[in-house]
Amino acid sequence: QTGVEIETFVHGALCYCYSGQCLMSSMIGGRSGNRGRCAQPCRLPWTFRSDSREKSGYLLSPKDLCSLQLLPDLIDAGVDSLKIEGRMKKPEYAALTAYLYRKYTDLYLTGGREHYHVDQADLEQLMDLYNRGGFTDGYFYRHNGQEMMSVKRPNHSGLNIGQGRINRRGEMEIQPMKALG
């Protein structure tokens, strides 16, 4: 009951730090993430070393945030405005993402919690559009942890369209997982 409009970030690239608090880009790349110029050093490969082990990968690279499943809780908490990342993304990304968040906001506002269900096909569309090894619900319900990170790759993981095999003639054949086109 603040009388102030409340906005929350609901979809897109998560900052490793709490957004607006990261100094790593300034210190390493000379570009302030707090001024919209983040060099994304969290998306670089890093190596963790201790006396007993070493681990390499994209250890500081979070998966992208997807809050479609959380919309009822966010609306009930009094959130007025949903922020969707779109910087340096294709128009298709912004269009589909905004469409789906509008669709599910309207679904909840008209049908309530008992009729609220996010279709798997819609989540798959978002995954096909852009994801870093899956989505996370970020910091909404728990502290960050390994399940929040995309340590194998820092960028779009592409589309899994099927399985390939080499036939007897030495040609590549692809067995599609679903209809293409």
Tell where the protein language model's regions lie, with residue ranges.
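Surface-exposed amphipathic alpha-helical tracts and adjacent flexible/coil segments at the periphery
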Residues: 1-181
